[in-house]
UniProtKB/Swiss-Prot annotation:
Catalysis performed (reactions): 1-(2-carboxyphenylamino)-1-deoxy-D-ribulose 5-phosphate + H(+) = (1S,2R)-1-C-(indol-3-yl)glycerol 3-phosphate + CO2 + H2O
Disulfide bonds: none
Protein family: Belongs to the TrpC family.
Any one GO BP annotation for this protein: L-tryptophan biosynthetic process
EC number: 4.1.1.48
HAMAP family hit by this protein: IGPS_B (MF_00134_B)
Keywords on record: Amino-acid biosynthesis, Aromatic amino acid biosynthesis, Decarboxylase, Lyase, Tryptophan biosynthesis
GO molecular function: indole-3-glycerol-phosphate synthase activity; phosphoribosylanthranilate isomerase activity
Protein name: Indole-3-glycerol phosphate synthase
The keyword Oxidoreductase is assigned to this record: no
Pathway per the UniProt entry: Amino-acid biosynthesis; L-tryptophan biosynthesis; L-tryptophan from chorismate: step 4/5
Length: 259
C-alpha cells in the first residue's frame, strides 16, 4: 500500500529531526514567534470557488513533474495570479519536497498575504509544532492514516497554535470520523491514497453529506476549467490543484484558464 510505505519511509527522518531539535526546545521556539498565522478558513470563503495552488515537484504516480523547480518563483506566480492559499508539499522521499521549501516561501515574502498549507503525512504532535516553526498557517491531516483519537489530538494542538487544518477524507466512513472530530475544513480527496487511482465522483458522492457550516475543498485529478465548473455546481468552496499547474509551461496562463 502506497500510503503505508510513505509513512514508514519517513519515520527515520522524523526521529532524526527530534534528535537535532528536541520537542521542548521546538515548543519554546514556536511560542516566541511574534506573528499569528494567517486564517486559511477566511481566505477560502466567498461566492466563487477558491484555488489552493500547490507547490509540487514530484509524485509517486508521475515522478518528476517539473525539472526547473523553484518553489519561491512558483509561489510568487500563484500569489500574483489569483490563488487564495498555497499548499507546499514537504514530504522528501516520494514527492521531493522539504520543510526548507516552506520556510523559503514564507521568508521570501512573495506570498505574504496568503496562508501556507503544509502538505505532508502528519501523525505526530512534533510535526505540528515544526509546521508552525517553518512558516505554515495550516496543515493537512489525513483521516486514513490517523486514529480518531490522534486526529482529535492533532486538531486541538493545531488550533491551540492558531493554525487551521485541512482534514482529508476519501470515503464516507472517513468523512464521518472527520465530522465527529468537529473538523471545519474538509478535503475530499478524489485520489485513493492506497492505490493512487483518481475518481472525481468521490466529491460528487460525499459533498451532500457535509453540513453547510463546513468549508469543502475538492482535491486531486482537477485538470481543466470544466472540472472546476462541475465541482462548483456541486457546491465546493475551493479546489486544490497541483500537477496541472506545476506541469504547465506557463503556470500563470494555466491559472487564468482555471479561474
Amino acid at each position: 500500500m502506497i500510503l503505508e510505505r510513505i509513512v514508514t519511509d519517513n519515520l527515520p527522518d522524523l526521529e532524526r529531526r527530534k534528535m537535532r531539535l528536541p520537542l521542548a526546545k521546538l515548543q519554546e521556539l514556536v511560542l516566541d514567534i511574534p506573528y499569528p498565522p494567517i486564517d486559511m478558513a477566511m481566505k477560502l470563503k466567498g461566492r466563487q470557488v477558491r484555488l489552493i495552488a500547490e507547490v509540487k515537484k514530484a509524485s509517486p504516480s508521475k515522478g518528476i513533474i517539473r525539472s526547473d523547480f523553484d518553489p519561491v518563483d512558483i509561489a510568487g506566480i500563484y500569489a500574483r495570479n489569483g490563488a487564495s492559499a498555497i499548499s507546499v508539499l514537504t514530504e522528501e522521499h516520494h514527492f521531493m519536497g522539504s520543510l526548507d521549501n516552506l520556510k523559503k516561501i514564507r521568508e521570501s515574502g512573495v506570498a505574504s498575504k496568503l496562508p501556507l498549507l503544509r502538505k505532508d503525512f502528519i501523525h505526530d504532535p512534533y510535526q505540528v509544532y515544526e509546521s508552525r516553526l517553518y512558516g505554515a498557517d495550516a496543515i493537512l491531516l489525513i483521516v486514513a492514516m490517523l486514529s480518531p483519537e490522534r486526529l482529535q489530538e492533532l486538531l486541538s494542538l493545531s488550533h491551540k497554535l492558531g493554525m487551521k487544518c485541512l482534514v482529508e477524507v476519501h470515503t464516507r466512513s472517513e468523512l464521518e470520523i472527520a465530522l465527529e472530530s468537529n473538523a471545519r475544513i474538509i478535503g475530499l480527496n478524489n485520489r485513493d491514497l492506497h492505490t493512487f487511482k483518481i475518481d472525481l465522483t468521490v466529491t460528487e458522492r460525499l459533498r451532500p453529506l457535509i453540513p453547510p457550516e463546513c468549508i469543502v475543498v475538492s482535491e486531486s485529478g482537477i485538470q481543466t476549467r470544466a472540472d472546476i465548473s462541475r465541482l462548483e455546481e456541486l457546491g465546493v468552496d475551493a479546489v486544490l490543484v497541483g500537477e496541472a499547474l506545476t506541469a504547465s509551461v506557463d503556470i500563470a496562463a494555466k491559472m487564468r484558464e482555471l479561474l
